[in-house]
């Protein structure tokens, strides 16, 4: 069973993993059987990180309650999401409660070395706390992250790696953690020889996405992060990537992603205040992981994401090229329709009035499985809503359909169906039919399969998808 290890570096890495987990839940086609996320971020209290960790725990709890066999038709929650590290996080050693100068032990250096360090780093850099990341300073990050290869967590990753497994790296190019972490991690994976299975890892298929600036930060004199420097940092980093990554064939597939329409966020250096709404760019970055997982690369390939039609308006399904629209439309739509049933019509679908409950699902509705399922579908709707209200809006779905469940896809008029039933009466009819066709025996699996069969039939009937 092949695995895809996904390294999410910094806050951007955590946010992209959030979008990718949503796609996994919905059943977007992924080439590998098992996904192993690994987050690299010294800021353990980063709210973007803790939110993603909670989501992945939610997914794993649901997945652990399901036992799929070849006859189960559902695509929801089909892939395994494995945890090999505490909180999925590769811990960076010796950074807790330390400034950068304490980390490098500046006072113990010879005077000539101290003078050199003070030339390379400002006093503000030297006094910078390591607890909340590198605050847009890849020069600091390069020194701190250089020791991850010696960590126990990296050894755990290496010990688990097997022939045929693949690696994908998510990072931003304009910050501190991502900009420094990506080149260092890639070099370690390709050339490192001090860890288990290094020969297999050195020759593994590796892909990465580097995300260019897609947001700005409000001015804050007390913050060390200045978004006006993002572009200059990006230009320098791109030149480095060209000469030291692309040209030496150290990577199999390198994806680039950027947007010139920028949201402006609060300038929070890290911790529990750093929680940003989901963004189109993070959604698209997750599709790069999907693309990489479904392809093989015989030589270095550089890929830049493109949309078919966008103009000045929101991004909808019609903005995607045909292949990507086909990959995303059905699973995301089926899952949003199930989410609406479980969040807005749950009282009915958990009652005896719903015929499918007769001789099925006894005791299920008060279980932790249903609670977990409601939580993740609510999170899915929140995620869609966050992306929709951004300045660069990803407007895939109407999230206020109320009693018109088929008015759900933005820009798509649902087709008429030959039936005396409509709206949620038609949804109920399709679910009642679906439960009779389920191959699953256990209630948890049968419940998920019922919704998948019912929603997939409706999406085909209403949207010809």
Q: Predicted segment positions?
A:
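Beta-strand elements within well-structured catalytic alpha/beta cores of enzymes
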Residues: 166-170
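Gly/Ser/Thr-rich loops at beta-strand to alpha-helix junctions
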Residues: 9-15, 171-182
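Terminal, contiguous helix-loop blocks that mediate binding/assembly
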Residues: 1-25, 29-165, 194-465
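Short Gly/Thr/Asp-enriched flexible loops that form oxyanion-binding sites at enzyme active sites
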Residues: 21, 178-190
């Amino acid at each position: 069973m092949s695995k895809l290890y996904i390294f999410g570096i910094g806050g951007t890495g955590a946010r992209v993993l959030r979008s990718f987990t949503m796609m996994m839940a919905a059943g977007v086609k992924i080439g590998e059987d098992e996904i192993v996320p690994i987050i690299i971020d010294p800021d353990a209290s980063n709210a973007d990180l803790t939110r993603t960790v909670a989501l992945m725990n939610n997914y794993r709890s649901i997945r652990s309650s399901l036992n799929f066999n070849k006859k189960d038709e559902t695509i929801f929650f089909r892939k395994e999401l494995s945890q090999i590290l505490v909180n999925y996080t590769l811990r960076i050693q010796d950074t807790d409660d330390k400034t950068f100068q304490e980390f490098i032990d500046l006072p113990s250096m010879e005077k000539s070395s101290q003078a050199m360090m003070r030339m390379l780093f400002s006093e503000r850099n030297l006094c910078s706390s390591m607890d909340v990341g590198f605050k847009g300073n890849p020069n600091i990050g390069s020194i701190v992250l250089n020791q991850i290869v010696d960590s126990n967590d990296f050894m755990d990753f290496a010990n688990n790696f097997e022939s045929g497994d693949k690696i994908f790296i998510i990072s931003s190019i304009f910050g501190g953690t991502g900009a420094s972490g990506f080149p260092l991690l890639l070099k370690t994976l390709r050339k490192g020889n001090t860890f288990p299975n290094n020969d297999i890892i050195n020759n593994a298929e590796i892909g990465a996405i580097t995300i260019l600036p897609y947001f700005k930060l409000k001015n804050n004199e007390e913050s060390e992060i200045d978004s006006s420097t993002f572009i200059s940092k990006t230009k320098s980093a791109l030149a480095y990537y060209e000469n030291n990554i692309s040209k030496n064939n150290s990577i199999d597939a390198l994806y680039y992603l950027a947007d010139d329409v920028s949201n402006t966020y609060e300038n929070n250096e890290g911790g529990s205040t750093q929680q940003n709404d989901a963004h189109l760019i993070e959604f698209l970055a997750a599709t790069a992981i999907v693309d990489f997982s479904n392809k093989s690369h015989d030589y270095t390939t550089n890929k830049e994401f493109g949309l078919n039609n966008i103009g000045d308006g929101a991004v909808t399904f019609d903005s995607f090229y045909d292949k990507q629209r086909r990959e995303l439309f059905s699973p995301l739509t089926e899952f949003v329709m199930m989410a609406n049933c479980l969040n807005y019509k749950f009282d009915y679908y958990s009652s005896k009035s719903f015929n499918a409950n007769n001789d099925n699902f006894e005791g299920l509705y008060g279980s932790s499985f249903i609670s977990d399922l409601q939580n993740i579908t609510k999170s899915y709707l929140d995620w869609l809503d966050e992306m929709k209200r951004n300045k660069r809006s990803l407007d895939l779905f109407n999230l206020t359909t109320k009693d018109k469940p088929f008015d759900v896809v933005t820009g798509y008029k649902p087709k008429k169906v030959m039936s005396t039933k409509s709206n949620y009466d038609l949804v109920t009819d399709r679910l009642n039919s679906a439960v009779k066709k389920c191959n699953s025996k256990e209630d948890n699996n049968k419940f998920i399969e019922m919704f998948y069969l019912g929603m997939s039939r409706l999406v085909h009937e209403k949207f010809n998808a």
